[in-house]
Amino acid sequence: MRDLNIRWLGKLPYSEAYDLQLGLHRSVSQEDSKDDYLLLLEHNNVITSGRSSKENNLLVSKDQLHELGIEYFETDRGGDITYHGDGQLIGYPIIRLSDPKKVIPFVRNLENVIIDSLRKFKIDSFTKEDDTGVWTPKGKIASVGIKVSKWTTYHGFSLNIFDSLDGYQLINPCGNQSEQITSIHEFNPNISFEAVSYTHLTLPTNREV
């Protein structure tokens, strides 16, 4: 039986969170390890591109991003380009899979954890068979992109809570020009960041995420 250790890290720059993931990944991927981790945090404004990212999905230059105070990182996760920033809950599960072929079920479980969380706030959401993430009738509300190495996952998901989504105007989110992006606050502006974070602190222990 493996133990899931859930850590709330507050606001953390992307580079620091990435280094922390790599350190935990080295530990979790050891055959005698019994501990998995779920890191919950918030990032400073940053745009990240995944292994499937195309250059034209970044709609401004990197110099313009710098002028706007937005960092840019090329990453080794799956997926295309996305934005992280204020009011967005980030979850990084560093978990050793029982079978490295179970990547797709792992991603589906992550999506279901988010759907369960949104349901607690009376927000209906759903997945798409040919895509990853979570959608609502108003648009996409959460993104998922992971990497598996040595049977162990890292990277993870982002869930939009506040409606400060200006950064998405600088990209084609996940490579989709027509993608509509929404947030929890577009359904109920009274839901706090802390309330959503607490929900994720408790839900994953009941699932194989």
For each feature predicted by the language model, list its residue ranges.
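A structural signal for short, well-ordered beta-strand segments
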Residues: 91-93, 132, 144-146, 157-161, ...
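Conserved small/polar residues in nucleotide/adenosyl-binding loops
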Residues: 199-205
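A hydrophobic, small-residue-rich beta->alpha segment in the mid-to-C-terminal subdomain
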Residues: 162, 166-198
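N-terminal lobe of the biotin/lipoate ligase/transferase fold
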Residues: 1-141, 190
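Short, conserved beta-strand/beta-arch hydrophobic-aromatic motifs that form part
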Residues: 58-64, 141-165
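Short conserved catalytic/interaction loops centered on acidic-Pro-aromatic/His motifs
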Residues: 123-128, 154-155, 166-171
